[in-house]
Amino acid sequence: MKTRAEIYGNEAAALLRIVTMYPGLNMQQLLCFHPGKSETAKALLSHLERQGRIFQSDNGGYFPAGYSPKADQALIKAVWVLLDFIQQADYHAPAEFPVKLVFFADGELYEVAYVAHGQEALVCHALRGNKGGSRRIILVLSLIHI
């Protein structure tokens, strides 16, 4: 017979991993990583909070213990794109400027980049020449940035 810890241990570890990789995600985003298991995920978030392993900031974002509650808004926006592919995603991870995150879905590598106001030329230069053959998804705040 399995204990409760054995049953939920992997799910709790996966949830803690998501909070650590993408600090500042809100509950809705975290629940999307666990489709069909929202009640379990909510209970695990509460459990991780009580253990002192994560905390929820005043704006609703979840952070690992010891982190400053300052979220990377560009990364949070990029995670929404990832969540559109989450059922097909085999792997995902944060990335370095100008790409905010990368993921594999359906045998393709995707890079999600965020272009902030005033960084258009810099990001364009940094993304020039796609040698890796990845598919790029570019996030902009407004159509005037295109």
How should these model regions be labeled?
Residues 1-14:
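Short alpha-helical segments that sit at the start of domains
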Residues 18-22:
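Short helix-capping/hinge SLiMs at alpha-helix to coil transitions
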Residues 24-33:
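Short acidic, hydrophobic short linear motifs in intrinsically disordered regions
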Residues 36-47:
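Short amphipathic alpha-helical interaction segments
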Residues 52:
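Glycine-centered, phosphate/nucleic-acid-interacting loop/turn motifs that mediate DNA/RNA or nucleotide
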Residues 55-128:
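Nucleic-acid-binding surface
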Residues 118-119, 135-142:
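DNA-contacting interfaces and partner/effector-binding or oligomerization modules
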Residues 144-146:
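Conserved small/polar residues in nucleotide/adenosyl-binding loops
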